[in-house]
Amino acid sequence: MDTTAVASKGSTNVGSSTDTLSTSASLHPSMNAGSVNEYSEQQRHGTNSFNGKPSVHDSVGSDASVSNGHNNHNESSLWTSGIPKALEEATKSKKPDSLVSTSTSGCASAHSVGYQNIDNLIPSPLPESASRSSSQSSHQRHSRDGRGELGSEHGERRSAMDGLRDRHIRKVRVSQLLDLQRRRIRPADHTTKDRYGIQDFNFLQTLGTGSFGRVHLVQSNHNRLYYAIKVLEKKKIVDMKQIEHTCDERYILSRVQHPFITILWGTFQDAKNLFMVMDFAEGGELFSLLRKCHRFPEKVAKFYAAEVILALDYLHHNQIVYRDLKPENLLLDRFGHLKIVDFGFAKRVSTSNCCTLCGTPDYLAPEIISLKPYNKAADWWSLGILIFEMLAGYPPFYSENPMKLYENILEGKVNYPSYFSPASIDLLSHLLQRDITCRYGNLKDGSMDIIMHPWFRDISWDKILTRKIEVPYVPPIQAGMGDSSQFDAYADVATDYGTSEDPEFTSIFKDF
Amino acid sequence: MSFEEVYEELKALVDEQNPSDVLQFCYDFFGEKLKAERSVFRRGDTITESFSDGDESDFLSELNDMVAGPEAIGPDAKYVPELGGLKEMNVSYPQNYNLLRRQSVSTESMNPSAFALETKRTFPPKDPEDLKRLKRSVAGNFLFKNLDEEHYNEVLNAMTEKRIGEAGVAVIVQGAVGDYFYIVEQGEFDVYKRPELNITPEEVLSSGYGNYITTISPGEYFGELALMYNAPRAASVVSKTPNNVIYALDRTSFRRIVFENAYRQRMLYESLLEEVPILSSLDKYQRQKIADALQTVVYQAGSIVIRQGDIGNQFYLIEDGEAEVVKNGKGVVVTLTKGDYFGELALIHETVRNATVQAKTRLKLATFDKPTFNRLLGNAIDLMRNQPRARMGMDNEYGDQSLHRSPPSTKA
């Protein structure tokens, strides 16, 4: 009698928990609408821009194939082949309803295709029957345990169990989500070469400068939209022995496709320079915002960290290390979402470890400094530095003298300011962990250790990925007008762009 | 809480802190109050809270809280209109902290698998006395800390001797490219620095070295950042005395030696791990994780690595040297050499060591333990446990649970 009563109570609870799932499921159609709207901007870039050049079509087709191709579990295979095969199988296995939104827009943006699939999958992270029976049995167990106890205690125990189960469901949902986002990648034969030329753009002011060149704001002469072009001086690249890094940058950017990673539309070269056409992220650098705010409240830092984590997870699962995480390389788009830019040090690491020292001194992991071959774990260290810097306003290790700085990093002693919450300190102590066999992100559960960390408990990861969450800060810009007010002013220099005399190093940079 | 109480509290705070922007201060104060009260209210129904998967409305309300959150109260933060919902918050920056954009640094890209194919460059060996002196010079530097004996000598042998006959010669000039690291053997050098940032070496040479900083004496070194990457020299170093002798080491040679060896060691680890039957259920990626986690330990001849009867959780691979396996009452049962391993069953079972392993010569071992294994690979242990080979390992020819010899093919 007692048992049945509690069991039935249990089952209503199951009902309510599936409710939670279905609520989020019912949210999704509207989310889709939102995401299609949001991305329609990009669709226009893709379809209308640079007239007649079918730039996005190819990537969309294969994108659908990759995100649908459940057989495509092997990460390394993404880099090699299997794309046409995956495409074939995907078309077979495609559910008609999942194509609805894609067909309405004719050429749907890559993003909405991908997330349509995510939405279809999310409501059932566990097989329907499995999730029901497991939760039911947990309640039955409960009812036995709980017999004869006082109501209030009973309630507490039940909520603890529910909390555990809830965490499990959440974990399954998140891992499913990650699984999907990781498989979205552009095909290997996706070419960026010669799609555009210097005559297609009107070069405007400088948005930033680097060791090998500068980034310009440009306006397309065809669709009048604004883009950013990174110009690299070939001779400098060769002199500074960065050929491999530059070629890797082009290759990796031409393959990746992620909401928080900048899009490479195409590349070209003239006699002296390389050009990379990318999105113009109008909101400026996260660096500038951070320095203006001095530091971010936890909620804000958490939001930006979450977007970075998804991007890093995506890169790592496609066997790429990023190696230069810092607020200077995180741009805000017009909506206030992040875009990771500058893949100058990104590298494919399918088999080997890295041994080139690169990055930014404040963000270098101890294993890089102590001349050990290193791997993806170094990016998670940098994430720790980034979160610390967002929360504190300055990085955890600092010295004017670089050698002293490196000694500090190796020593690994972090002073947490008093306003850091215990949860953030706990997470940071696991990221700023000198021993890579203890560092979060590098353990058996990979990035899940970070994603499921209590500090991110109030983050809804699917909403982060679909960008359906209110951003903490919307850049005060006039969108689509080529507004570069969020960028610092740089002195313009005379440029020699477009020269065709004495072409240099064309064989080295033949893919540009 | 009555209105009077709230008012009194606010008044006291305003009197105490005397905020410049009174309206903002009051706004923050009430926001804080409201939030505190709501959070008490919310605590009442934790059950629904625990069900919410980061409910959007919750997240939004908390985002709104940021505007007037506890962190943003009073003297801690300042309202800046351009920052939208965000605020300028108080930070005590570290002394001399540079708030400017940071430049990336990089060494030349290097591919160790390519130069493993090339013949190894050799350098003429230096006099042992010289080596000892050089080694003492760099002992405290972290760049040399991870080098073991033979690589240390290799690096130091790669240093070239330079003689500087006169005083007043600049060895390095501020702002110039940094390619070399130097150790002073004989003579003294002065260090000077110009306060300007990004000064060119031409300017330094034409208009003076700047302020005197310090003097470098024999046995000391300078320019060590050049071993890490090419950064412009931060100061100038000028000979103070005549008849100077310095040793120079360039970054490329240094890094090449270090990574060539690291690469060889890594290849050795991977091939050794492949030969361990108990690990054969792991894939290449998992074995790489173990190779990453291996720690080198060195035992001097005669010291004991594991002792019969002890409970152990460490696994060992012999990188170099010889070890004797001793069983109580039986004496030495076998000698293990490079490529052999022992203690691998400690990774799966709590085992009592069935023999003692003692270093016969200087013994270099690579080791990792069960907790590390669990952290990195987790349930891969279950796979291993169910393997017939793992069970076979328990009845090997020595009737010993924790000793195993690899097939002869692995012996280089």
UniProtKB/Swiss-Prot annotation, chain A:
Activated by cAMP. One of its GO terms (cellular component) is cytoplasm. It comes from the Eukaryota. Residues 1-15, 32-52, 62-79 have a biased composition (Polar residues). It catalyses: L-seryl-[protein] + ATP = O-phospho-L-seryl-[protein] + ADP + H(+); L-threonyl-[protein] + ATP = O-phospho-L-threonyl-[protein] + ADP + H(+). GO terms for molecular function: ATP binding; cAMP-dependent protein kinase activity; protein serine kinase activity; protein serine/threonine kinase activity. Residues 1-79, 118-166 are annotated as: Disordered. This is cAMP-dependent protein kinase catalytic subunit. The lineage of its organism: Eukaryota, Fungi, Dikarya, Ascomycota, Taphrinomycotina. The gene is pka1.
Curated annotation (Swiss-Prot), chain B:
GO terms for biological process: adenylate cyclase-activating G protein-coupled receptor signaling pathway; cellular response to glucose starvation; negative regulation of adenylate cyclase-activating glucose-activated G protein-coupled receptor signaling pathway; positive regulation of protein export from nucleus. InterPro entries: cAMP-dep_PK_reg_su-like, cAMP_dep_PK_reg_su, cAMP_dep_PK_reg_su_I/II_a/b, cNMP-bd_CS, cNMP-bd_dom, cNMP-bd_dom_sf, RmlC-like_jellyroll. 3',5'-cyclic AMP 1 binds at residues 143-277. The modification Phosphoserine is found at residue 104. The keyword Nucleotide-binding applies. GO terms for cellular component: cAMP-dependent protein kinase complex; cytoplasm; cytosol; nucleus. CDD domains: CAP_ED. One of its GO terms (molecular function) is cAMP-dependent protein kinase inhibitor activity. Pfam families: cNMP_binding, RIIa. Residues 392-412 are annotated as: Disordered. The keyword Repeat applies. Residues 1-142 are annotated as: Dimerization and phosphorylation. A motif (Pseudophosphorylation motif) lies at residues 101-105. 3',5'-cyclic AMP 2 binds at residues 278-412. Keywords: cAMP, cAMP-binding, Nucleotide-binding, Phosphoprotein, Repeat. Tetramer, composed of 2 regulatory (R) and 2 catalytic (C) subunits. In the presence of cAMP it dissociates into 2 active monomeric C subunits and an R dimer. Belongs to the cAMP-dependent kinase regulatory chain family. This is cAMP-dependent protein kinase regulatory subunit. It comes from Schizosaccharomyces pombe (strain 972 / ATCC 24843). The lineage of its organism: Eukaryota, Fungi, Dikarya, Ascomycota, Taphrinomycotina. The gene is cgs1.
